[in-house]
Amino acid sequence: MTAEAAMVLPAMVAVTAALVWVLSLVLGQVRVVDAAREGARVAARGDGEAAAVAAARRVAPSGATVSVVRSGDTVTVTVTARLDGPGGVVGSLPGAEVAADAVAAVEVGV
């Protein structure tokens, strides 16, 4: 191994780890958005708050918090999750909190 390669290899590993971390944050955000949408859909159908929370938690990352607020003819579901950093060699990368809201119109007759 040349000296140049020995100098570049740690930087390449760090950049790769950072890219994996960013990708995991993006995937976590997508799961939170999907969970909020699913919860809002169930709540808008009239299945009740407990069913909406359960539906959202099935899709959300583990440990996520789900809230359902019904206001007039709309229902808003908010999902928030704390995503841990990657740990290991790159343990200095922080975790992040991701959140999403979904609003749905309550179906007529519900």
Predicted region positions:
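Short, conserved structural patches
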Residues: R45, E49-V110
